[in-house]
């Protein structure tokens, strides 16, 4: 059994990492089987959150209105993760959004900043 890892989950504005955005990251850093740190932060999206997504996630436009932009939050999340193993319930979905968002933010000027 793993003793050190990051368990994380995302909430997004849709299902397509190329066209939708991460609006919340939640993560737990586990060391020797115990939670040692937490990372929970909203991300301010470029587009308004639809009523359908609010119904699904419970996250409203008011909740993200004062959130930091994606570049700041993703940078902090990457720093939080260090070189740990990432695990999650729907890991393929969450990892694809994280990777795609990081690539969009750090490989070219992006309107998602």
What are these regions (language model features)?
Residues 1-104:
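Conserved non-catalytic scaffold segment of RNase H-like nuclease domains
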């Amino acid at each position: 059994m793993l003793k050190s890892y990051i368990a994380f989950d995302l909430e997004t504005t849709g299902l397509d990492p190329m066209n939708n955005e991460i609006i919340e990251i939640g993560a737990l850093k586990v060391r020797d089987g115990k939670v040692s740190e937490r990372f929970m932060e909203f991300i301010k999206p470029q587009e308004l959150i639809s009523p359908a997504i609010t119904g699904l996630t419970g996250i409203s436009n008011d909740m993200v209105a004062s959130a930091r932009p994606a570049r700041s939050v993703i940078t902090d999340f990457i720093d939080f993760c260090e070189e740990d193993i990432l695990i999650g319930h729907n890991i393929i979905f969450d990892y694809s959004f994280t990777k795609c968002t990081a690539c969009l933010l750090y490989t070219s000027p992006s309107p998602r900043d």
